[in-house]
Amino acid sequence: MTARAVRGTKDLFGKELRMHQRIVATARKVLEAAGALELVTPIFEETQVFEKGVGAATDIVRKEMFTFQDRGGRSLTLRPEGTAAMVRAYLEHGMKVWPQPVRLWMAGPMFRAERPQKGRYRQFHQVNYEALGSENPILDAEAVVLLYECLKELGLRRLKVKLSSVGDPEDRARYNAYLREVLSPHREALSEDSKERLELNPMRILDSKSERDQALLKELGVRPMLDFLGEEARAHLKEVERHLERLSVPYELEPALVRGLDYYVRTAFEVHHEEIGAQSALGGGGRYDGLSELLGGPRVPGVGFAFGVERVALALEAEGFGLPEEKGPDLYLIPLTEEAVAEAFYLAEALRPRLRAEYALAPRKPAKGLEEALKRGAAFAGFLGEDELRAGEVTLKRLATGEQVRLSREEVPGYLLQALG
């Protein structure tokens, strides 16, 4: 059997890889302009980091993690999300004594054992941003703005910002009690997943993908979480709204918005794209003031977001954003004799890295060499024949115009740099 990439994973190269690189580079520009420090965490952590941080009752922990034992018997997990690992790093490296808030960002692969579909993979890539060390609602608004700016800076326009609040723990306890009271008599009408959620975390039913569940919620007229907010959580949300309005960030309140991670408190938000189908959320985030305590540290309030690189690439494609063809070499050297092959290699090495130089690995007839240079998208072809070797020269041909010139090897770098601008 021929080896293939595992289902739900893919190799990245060419245009697709360059699109990923462009997305991450744009995020770097936006986030580092806001003072965020880049962080790179390991791709696996002790399993308890996610069990405690993400929540043992979440779908991610119960069904979607890739978990294994190391040779010492420790349970380790490939990271399914970035926030818990970034907060762990903040605690481990004593960032609490730095000037607060500490803004961090990270880009890299995440892993979830999900059913692969368009825009959703078992290995996927995220950009994460976290601001740790303050409860100020300005930071919540800043996180929304930064996510929106990352996507706008890429050129995306068909964006919808959805804002909500999941309240404080006491608010959620009241809301979960209400949901159990309303939904328990109709338990058998729920999907199998939501029957489990009814016991573990009823709020997650609001986010169910089951049409049956959504129809039942509508039929019963289930009230939104926003109706159960306490005074402090309500005031916090109002402040976030005020800041967004002051900055003219278009948003809509989404009462049914529930993030899939247990650590969220108060602010929750998502940015959706209008034209990428069922998986329309490009990214989202919220506030998580108690996460550090779940990981064994002191209380450190925080807020952040993540967006999926593959999802954003789909949105860019839907809006017609492409990338130019990959740039070919500045110079493609064509040896005309066996002896000239090594000389082509030596000259290419002398030109790199200032210039992109490639060469044929065997003698070519001029017409064949020109054909190869054109296929590679080269700006210039360089011929090395017996005459050129004897004289220590190269014949250069500009492929766009057919203009030809013969130069000493020492003159080649300067000529090409000037000609290529």
From Swiss-Prot:
Keywords: Aminoacyl-tRNA synthetase, ATP-binding, Cytoplasm, Ligase, Nucleotide-binding, Protein biosynthesis. Homodimer. Belongs to the class-II aminoacyl-tRNA synthetase family. PROSITE patterns: AA_TRNA_LIGASE_II. PANTHER family: HISTIDINE--TRNA LIGASE, MITOCHONDRIAL-RELATED (PTHR43707:SF1), HISTIDYL-TRNA SYNTHETASE (PTHR43707). This is Histidine--tRNA ligase. GO terms for biological process: histidyl-tRNA aminoacylation. It is found in: Cytoplasm. Its main location: cytoplasm. It catalyses: tRNA(His) + L-histidine + ATP = L-histidyl-tRNA(His) + AMP + diphosphate + H(+). Pfam families: HGTP_anticodon, tRNA-synt_His. It comes from Thermus thermophilus (strain ATCC 27634 / DSM 579 / HB8). The gene is hisS. Residues 1-171, 229-320 are annotated as: Catalytic. One of its GO terms (cellular component) is cytoplasm. Its EC number is 6.1.1.21.
